[in-house]
A protein has these predicted regions:
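Solvent-exposed loop/turn and edge beta-strand elements of beta-rich ligand-binding domains
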Residues: 1-229
């Protein structure tokens, strides 16, 4: 049996770092000491960028990267291959032992993009190229639409204002009809299209801006987690 789990809330924001854990079983090989034996775990993410393996254990042993196993990442798909072939040993020494891989990934998903604002993580284990188990985990990001109108007395007569500018904050305070927010809570976005922005991975991301501009009076901001803005 194999499973993959994410820790924490599954309703996340773009740029958030998540921790995942893959649990599987070290396989037994029919020809125990064959030099052709291979054991790999392949993790294929959508809306995620896998960054690092923080730990890998087999049974009670903590393995060392590049000594006991290797990790390679496909630059085109982002898929990560963990190759444990070095650790197979002789006479099926580790067969049946529990394998636990803990690693981190950054959320890149946003509503309206190819991933649809949903991150997915699929892990499969392979013995000599044959799949021995697989599992997947998923979560999502949210979005809000902001609207700016003129101040006509009758609401039905109000017109949406093209070019209206907004700054978006989280963790603000409201008292006596006034809203205050800390500069540190200001959010930064990257423009995708007119009136459409996604949360920046950081304020230093290329073309990141704290000002979002409405088209025909509305602007959509994506990649948000749960909260009040």
């Amino acid at each position: 049996k194999q499973k993959i789990e994410a820790t924490g809330n599954k309703f996340v924001k773009r740029g958030e770092t998540l921790t995942f854990e893959i649990t599987t079983t070290f396989p037994a090989f029919e020809k125990a000491d064959s030099k052709d034996n291979v054991f790999t775990i392949v993790d294929t993410p959508t809306g995620l960028d896998i960054t690092d393996i923080t730990s890998l254990t087999v049974g009670n042993a903590a393995l060392t990267k590049d000594t006991d196993y290797t990790m390679t990442k496909d630059s085109a798909t982002g898929a990560v291959t963990i190759d444990l072939t070095k650790y197979i040993g002789k006479e099926n020494a580790h067969a049946g032992q529990t394998v636990v891989v803990t690693y981190t990934a950054i959320v890149t998903a946003a509503e309206g993009t190819a991933d649809g604002g949903i991150y997915k993580n699929t892990a499969n284990a392979y013995r000599n190229g044959t799949e021995t188990g697989g599992d997947n985990e998923e979560g999502w990001t949210g979005d809000i639409t902001l609207t700016k109108t003129d101040d006509a007395e009758n609401e039905k007569d109000r017109k949406q204002l093209n070019g209206a500018e907004f700054e978006v904050y989280k963790n603000f305070e409201e008292k006596d009809g006034k809203v205050t927010a800390n500069e540190a809570d200001k959010l930064y976005f990257v423009k995708e299209a007119d009136g459409v922005y996604k949360l920046a991975l950081s304020k230093d991301e290329t073309n990141a801006t704290s000002t979002v501009v409405a088209t025909n009076g509305t602007v959509q901001v994506k990649g948000l987690d749960e909260g009040t803005y």
